[in-house]
Amino acid sequence: MTGTTRATRRTDSHPDLADPRVGAPFFSTWRVGTPLRQRRSVEAVAAAWERRPWPADDLLGYHVYTGHDASTLLHYSQWTSEQAYEAFARTRRQERVDEIDTAVPDIERLGLTRYRHYRSGGPADRGGRVPGCIVIVDVEFEGPDSARQHAWVDAVFEALAHEPAPHPGGISAHFHLSTDGTRVLNYAEWDSAQSHLDALSAPGDGIGSATALWERVQTWPGLKSTTVSRYDHALGLVPD
């Protein structure tokens, strides 16, 4: 970890999931129980971070999202390396955790998963579109298999390339592979939650049309489960 004296600044800007500097993207989930505790937890995170200097040059950004289930928070941090995160965890993480837990007791932390960014898709020119909803698609496979992770994502991109009726509400999709070889996480940006719901209600299973390519994606050997969750971007923290 490199030393820094930069301040911590709050931002409303969404993160760049495809930033090539991000060598170690981490996702984690907290269960806090109610919309009020969601809001209080977000403010507790902001307070614990903003009162302290930015912890490391190797941390590019930290973002928090409120789940549409009215119970959970998603956390996404952009590290240049796992080693940089480990140094932060040893020396600077606990003081923040303690302050947050004092403000909002009984947070259930459901674990942190380490990923690597693999592929992103979407129009080269977003036309200034700002995401109104973040959709997280969490795919779990039966056991570790890096080749299967890559092949499945490639199959998704092939199905998208031949999609006969792409939904206009989708802005981008950013696929991440867990370092343990068992999961794929798609961080998808949509213009609104309603657009995503409309896409799910269209003919076909999921957001894709009823094509052979999408059926191959959905029946991939070793595919164990798929979970879809919607979030709002609630807090961005970056170095000043």
Residue ranges with predicted function:
Residues 1-76, 80-240:
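Short S/T/G/P-rich N-terminal loop/turn motif that feeds into the first structured element of a domain
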